Amino acid sequence: LVVGLITHDAGKTTVARALISELVSRGYRVGVAKPVAGHNIWYQPASVRNSIENHILVGEDAVVLKKTSGSEDPLEAINPLDIALAPLDPIHYLRSLRSYEDAMASMISSAIMLRISICIERGINTAHYIVYRRLERIPSGVRRVVEDIALKVYPRPIAIDAEALEPLILEGYIASETCYRAIANRHQVMVIESFNNSASPLARLENIDAVIAVSPGKILIYDGLTYLKALKVVLDVEGSIYRRWWPTTSEVLRLLSPLEIIDTPYIEDINLFGEFTENLTDKIISISKEAKA
């Protein structure tokens, strides 16, 4: 399991990709999972291309992980819940630009499209949704891109009100487990990438050998079973009745001590990054073998 210590740009996908690539080069059959993903249409143009080419709403991370691993699992199963964000038009907030900043920082307030895929025995059921009235509150250039995606994805998006967005995301979050269960046993090794700084991308997480917590320039490695126990403590103590979303990584890690702390070299330093990847893979394999012993 690869998790982030910060909300954005922790480097989860970079580390996950490096680990997957090294495992594949050593002959492992690697499966990948990005159960929940969010991407911004304005800042991540590759997500627009991916969505149009694959005819489903999908970001960069899931596509990169699938390509790196060589997995034949469908993108919908690798990434069953995808949320597309779009910048809002500041013209609607001129009397309260602080509200504009708050809305731009909120996933719920800036989400424009959503895909939920549910894996069943006979295949995958997919639905797309679009917060239709929010189209009027985003800049025209972004609106055209959103409308283009909506025309290219299948099934066509269902129009929803903003109030329906959060319940749908929570529904998709819980349902994403169906796809993970469907693909997990097909592979020798599973590499799971969480979203933002969430402690877990699944409502029920089991059988994790190792956890890699990523921050810019540094990673911390934890025993998977110990991590899961700490996650359960956080959930049991605070209780879901007081919590709308899943715990953050920091809430869990404050209860633990890492097995290893490794400096991450600058990615452009090819030799050092290659050594880092080999070292990381060795440690993860060793921890996994101990967990299964």
Where would I find each of the regions flagged by the language model?
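Hydrophobic positions on the alpha1 helix immediately C-terminal to the Walker A/P-loop
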Residues: 15
